[in-house]
């Protein structure tokens, strides 16, 4: 049986590929795919405006190719983990 961390990492990878395979290059997230991922997989997603998601894409897109590759997605996950950690620290 896989350890919880193994399962969590596998899920993060699977979610990337679930959305990246919907349009164009199956190894990148388009603006539409990223928007759908955020809105469906994150609690805060439904609260974000289109302009905020567009800004997020621009910030994540380090090489400015108008898509988010897996490395850029992992950077996004790292930033989310930092935010979640701060929230948890504040609650305790």
From Swiss-Prot:
GO CC terms, sorted: cytoplasmic side of plasma membrane; cytosol; nuclear envelope; nucleus; perinuclear region of cytoplasm
Keyword annotations of the record: Acetylation, Calcium, Cell membrane, Cytoplasm, Membrane, Metal-binding, Nucleus, Repeat
Gene3D superfamilies cross-referenced by the UniProt entry: EF-hand
Subcellular localization(s) per the UniProt record: Nucleus envelope; Cytoplasm; Cell membrane
Matching SUPFAM superfamilies: EF-hand (SSF47473)
Binding site for Ca(2+) 1: 28, 33
InterPro entries named among the record's database cross-references: EF-hand-dom_pair, EF_Hand_1_Ca_BS, EF_hand_dom, S-100A6, S100/CaBP7/8-like_CS, S100_Ca-bd_sub
Origin superkingdom: Eukaryota
The keyword Cytoplasm is annotated on this UniProt entry: yes
Modified residues (N6-acetyllysine): 40
Main location: nucleus
UniProt GO molecular function: calcium ion binding; calcium-dependent protein binding; S100 protein binding
Coiled coil: none
Mode of membrane association: Peripheral membrane protein
Listed Pfam families: S_100
Its job: May function as calcium sensor and modulator, contributing to cellular calcium signaling. May function by interacting with other proteins, such as TPR-containing proteins, and indirectly play a role in many physiological processes such as the reorganization of the actin cytoskeleton and in cell motility. Binds 2 calcium ions. Calcium binding is cooperative.
Name of protein: Protein S100-A6
Source organism of the structure: Equus caballus (Horse)
Encoding gene, per UniProt annotation: S100A6
